[in-house]
């Protein structure tokens, strides 16, 4: 637990990171599904070694002639910088002086209550940024850094072309299960390491999901699923997401937006495996403070220190993360062109 700053030591910096991380991250479907594993690293770059093993059928040889030769792994090293996301806030005397406490008819506002509300807002801003960044990694295959301080395309970095499947949901004769089977087979073939896939999830735009459940070959199945599971259509979490299990795939409607722009483009759906270790990874690097040099990174940090002339208290926060698709080939883009 951080020690509250003593005003007898006006230049002391107080670490409120622990208090910040106690506030739960309740934002986002990707967080709820646990798609990304998290790992703290001690540097502001990550180095990834790509190892390819080629298998070959052996040919028969005449005894005594030169034998078949085994091929070793091929290795490639890739280094990626971790973007920096700072966020500051301030507590001013007028935030406390003469103010009524929230939810009270007469009690005066307290500094601790103001600080708590600001910490909660800071936490949510970092959480929503992380969710949007993870979704960008899935939909675009790139890292989130809107000011281009860092630029990484996971498909280009690993020389991979993303598989795409047109579901043609506007065509009544489309075999949706066959489309799904094509995607399932492709994902299983590209997992490569022998891990067992516990499920395939499709994160769908509202447009894709609505067309899916209205498609002639799916409509009756969805009616049956909805009526047996939940009369109001089964929804996840806070009730924002409709879901539908069909043909071995769990289709989930994702309605996340930022400034009116959907995080999943209209008519798109993104298919990915669940239960596979180290498939999707978020790396957190340490805060830009001397006391955190060469320490493993946390999800976010916040520090408090006095401002100029005793007129404000500064809350300085930051997060440093990169969302990596360790095997970008297992994310399949589905879409409907009609």
Show which residues each predicted segment covers.
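N-terminal alpha-helical "arm" segments
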Residues: 1-45, 324-338
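Hydrophobic alpha-helical segments and helix pairs
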Residues: 4-27, 151-179
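Short, Φ-rich (hydrophobic/aromatic) sequence segments
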Residues: 20, 179-187, 280-281, 290-291, ...
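Assembly/oligomerization interface modules of large self-assembling protein complexes
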Residues: 34-101
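A general structural signal for short secondary-structure junctions and capping/turn motifs
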Residues: 38, 190-195, 304-307, 323
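Long, contiguous amphipathic alpha-helices that act as assembly "spine/axial" helices in icosahedral shell
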Residues: 85-160, 175, 179, 185-210, ...
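A contiguous, surface-oriented mixed alpha/beta subdomain in the mid-to-C-terminal portion of proteins
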Residues: 166-262
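Sequence/fold signature of self-assembling virion shell proteins
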Residues: 219-338
